[in-house]
């Protein structure tokens, strides 16, 4: 018997990796399938799946499912990976992607074979007042920022060993009913910050587009930095401009094509 296969493209933006799949191949249970294919031992392995569907008002509609199967509003890096895929397929320099957080426009700034760089118009952020969260052993203060998805930005002097456990505790704190993405930020100077990410539905990631945006916006809002901000992550550098709207600039690389057996 010939197995049923689901074609995919794998892409990465600063080490934040995604599987891109045409919605025509979508199974009935997107949550379970996304969890299965993202598994790094028994699946292909990725931080999430971008499912692509037709859109009347954009080049494509992208539904993002995290590695744990939960659906999220948007990934800045995932959106850039989708743009790279469409750019390679259609030879376009401007890609519009309808996400759960609205339409995002990705403008190609450079390309070398399957390596792309885009600047993405991410929309206007919402910045809240800094507040504290009580954890099991201490209290932390952070700045809430919405980039179309929720973030809590915490400033630290250094990334202490085991920071992931504390970030996970923040992310599931009862103050955040639906969970939250957590960023730990070290200010390097007025235009450079270093960030670690713990994403809702994924865990630690090497980079995050919306997380980079949230970290830069929070740093500017609290007068610790000024636009543009270079965000240094374990996966590379992204640049954030905040001019009412946030503009996120960074790379995306198409890694491979493949087929996943059902």
What are these regions (language model features)?
Residues 1-114, 153-262:
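A glycine-rich beta-to-alpha transition motif near the start of alpha/beta enzyme domains, typified by
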Residues 114-122:
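Short, solvent-exposed secondary-structure boundary/capping segments
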Residues 126-128, 133-138, 143-147, 246-262:
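C-terminal domain-closing interface element
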Residues 149-151:
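Internal alpha/beta core interface subdomains
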């Amino acid at each position: 018997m010939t197995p049923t296969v689901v074609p995919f493209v794998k892409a990465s933006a600063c080490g934040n990796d995604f599987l891109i799949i045409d919605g025509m191949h979508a199974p009935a249970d997107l949550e379970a399938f996304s969890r299965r294919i993202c598994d790094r031992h028994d699946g292909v392995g990725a931080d999430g799946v971008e499912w692509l569907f037709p859109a009347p008002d954009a080049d494509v509609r992208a539904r993002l499912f995290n590695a744990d199967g939960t659906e999220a509003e948007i990934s800045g890096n995932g959106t850039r990976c989708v743009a790279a895929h469409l750019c390679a397929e259609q030879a376009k320099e401007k890609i519009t992607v309808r996400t759960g957080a609205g339409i995002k426009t990705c403008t190609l700034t450079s390309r070398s074979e399957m390596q792309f760089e885009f600047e993405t118009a991410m929309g206007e952020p919402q910045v809240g007042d800094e507040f504290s969260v009580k954890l099991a052993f201490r209290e932390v203060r952070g700045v809430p920022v919405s980039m179309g998805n929720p973030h809590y930005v915490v400033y630290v002097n250094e990334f202490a060993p085991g920071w992931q456990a504390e970030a996970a505790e923040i992310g599931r704190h009862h103050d955040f009913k639906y969970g939250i993405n957590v960023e730990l930020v070290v200010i390097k100077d007025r235009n450079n910050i270093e960030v670690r990410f713990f994403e809702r539905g994924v865990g630690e990631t090497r980079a995050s587009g919306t997380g980079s945006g949230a970290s830069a916006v929070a740093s500017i809002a609290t007068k610790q930095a000024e636009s543009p901000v270079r965000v240094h992550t374990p996966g590379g550098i992204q640049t954030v401009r905040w001019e009412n709207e946030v503009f996120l600039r960074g790379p995306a690389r198409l890694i491979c094509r493949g087929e996943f057996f059902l």
